[in-house]
């Protein structure tokens, strides 16, 4: 039996037939072994070409990895040898060619969900086998999936595969097929086994839809779409299919579904009935009827360390045989242990398979090993050395999870957090030629803080300032960095962005808790905390300013040791600990798919609410009592070197009698007009002018005696107060520009009926106050 399965060790022992495919440094031929009379595919690699292009190590690695593998879903490498001119790989012949060509030329339609599930199960089984041996394929695509004579799926082309030392090892090389490459690979971030999971998601989408999810006419535009991870999901796909694709194509590799979980997903259980991988002939017979038997080969391209590597693989069906030696130049036996029989893989001696992942599923962790803490990449031939050597940023990567979109302008930069969580810094310089400020540098940072893109838009001229950041652009791969290798000349930009994110976090509630005495809010920083007592007092705790206590009149209590302050601080400390415990408990309860934050616990006691303040649903400015804030959080002085909050005590102490008089009277509407295409303008008895815009946002202009400035409330209910000497965001500035004409119209409006009993001396003169900038979320 052994003699009938023996493969030749020289090219003369094969009858070489027609060409299947040709690449830059190799050709693939159909051939027949003269000993076993079996059809095979022979890949002939030109030694001179690979030596000239520096790809000798890549060929060595391909042979080293592929020769060890034996699995029903992996194309088998039978043997390899060489002569003076060529390295020869004798491969299993896939009679029915590549899956991509079969779908386009024979099936002439996308696969059904049942067919797609059958293919998916076989691919996942093969990848689990590879991953169980810490082998990352890095180029899973329909062109690299071949069909045997019995229509079984065969994973082929290990030209980009790499052997990891451990499952959580990370590499940095940018390689793969553009339509199937993962965001972390495009961004040159450290990546590992989850990169293959992303490719499986692209594969499944392509099978069911007929085209890749991020396909465009150009490679650069395709890679840009991959980085943004934005694709259209066809509505005709079932819920199970859509759910699985979304889980496979999660932008963050930590959030992607694992291959083990794919096998348990309802999409496979529903369409394949949860049965195990089938090795019986005709596993894909439901779509094989239209197949005309053909031999196939293909040539593909891959970018590896900026070099174009022409790769191809053969296109069937046999069992393995002994692995002969190859010249040390290409396959060092000291590393692989092929110099003697006892050092060869066990399946070569006994004809048995290496343990398949299916045998190990019950003992495998459902999560990717080691992905909670990404290890810094180490130096090897696949990794890009860090330009900064041993120096690293001293701050951890920023993170914008759960932060609302916002845009903030300083003197030299415009900072934004987008709906996707991406942070965008637009650095501004005055251009004399255009007589205006122009955007000269752009820094885009991913939501997890690990991918950074820095470039100059339209160098020399810059871009005009808009209400939103410029569209995403990657001018060249040299503009893309990751957290580990960011050059130190760009560190200040990263620090600037991180402090901006920290500022927004310090104003974004994570836990809202109603205690017996007040409304408590623990911010996303987990250190910033505030309590607004029902009595009107307030306690603020921040990592920069410590604890500040305000009494019911809005005045700062300078002596925190007095009885009044002590009681407020004690209650605040108790509530702070309670909120932290709630947060920790919910962190354990939440999953990748379902977050628990932000969360509101309890509600304000009914006895402490005025009748006019009890309302449900949307904000209705006519149905509750208006109140002017008696105190405001400090104004923000934002710079790259410091973020500080300041507030003068005199702001609270001056006009205190006046404030007390105003506080004694209900703040009710006295005038109201409706302005077409703008909204409803209301004047309150305390002098506040409010504009409720039709888009759901609201601007309140507060008179100087009340503290001055404006309060801007977004459509989602998030309020920001702007005070003295600060710039306004564009959205607020546009609305403020309309205020003078609205106030003029309001002056001509008659008083409302319920306003005639209000004492006239309590109404603030209608003067246009300057509009300044202070955040008080």
Curated annotation (Swiss-Prot):
The cross-references to PROSITE patterns, in alphabetical order and at most eight, read: CPB1, CPB2, POLO_BOX, PROTEIN_KINASE_ATP, PROTEIN_KINASE_DOM
The record's Pfam families line, in alphabetical order, gives: Pkinase, Plk4_PB1, Plk4_PB2
Q: Where in the cell is it found?
A: Cytoplasm, Cytoskeleton, Microtubule organizing center, Centrosome, Centriole
Residue intervals of the Protein kinase domain = 14-268
Q: What is its main location?
A: cytoplasm
Organism domain of life: Eukaryota
Which keywords does this chain's UniProt record carry? ATP-binding, Cytoplasm, Cytoskeleton, Kinase, Nucleotide-binding, Serine/threonine-protein kinase, Transferase, Ubl conjugation
In residue numbers, the region (Disordered) covers 371-390
The UniProt entry annotates the active site at 139
Q: EC number(s) for this protein?
A: 2.7.11.21
Q: Which Gene3D superfamilies match?
A: 2.40.50.930, 3.30.1120.120, 3.30.1120.130, Transferase(Phosphotransferase) domain 1
Feature: compositional bias, Polar residues: 371-381
Q: Which reaction does it catalyse?
A: L-seryl-[protein] + ATP = O-phospho-L-seryl-[protein] + ADP + H(+); L-threonyl-[protein] + ATP = O-phospho-L-threonyl-[protein] + ADP + H(+)
What is the annotated signal peptide range for this record? Answer: none
Choose any GO biological process term that the UniProt entry carries and state it: regulation of centriole replication
Q: Where is the Cryptic POLO box 1 (CPB1) domain?
A: 390-507
The keyword Kinase belongs to this UniProt entry's keyword annotation: yes
Where in the numbering of this chain does the Cryptic POLO box 2 (CPB2) domain appear?
A: 508-611
**What PTM annotation applies here?**
Ubiquitinated by the SCF(Slimb) ubiquitin ligase complex; leading to its degradation by the proteasome during interphase and regulating centriole number and ensuring the block to centriole reduplication.
Q: Where is the POLO box domain?
A: 669-748
**PANTHER family reported in the protein's UniProt record:** SERINE/THREONINE-PROTEIN KINASE PLK, SERINE_THREONINE-PROTEIN KINASE PLK4
Task: Describe its partners and assembly state.
Answer: Homodimer.
Functional summary from the UniProt entry: Serine/threonine-protein kinase that plays a central role in centriole duplication. Able to trigger procentriole formation on the surface of the mother centriole cylinder, using mother centriole as a platform, leading to the recruitment of centriole biogenesis proteins such as sas-6. When overexpressed, it is able to induce centrosome amplification through the simultaneous generation of multiple procentrioles adjoining each parental centriole during S phase.
Q: Which protein is depicted?
A: Serine/threonine-protein kinase PLK4
What is the native source organism of this protein?
A: Drosophila persimilis (Fruit fly)
**Taxonomic classification, please?**
Eukaryota, Metazoa, Ecdysozoa, Arthropoda, Hexapoda
- Gene of origin? SAK
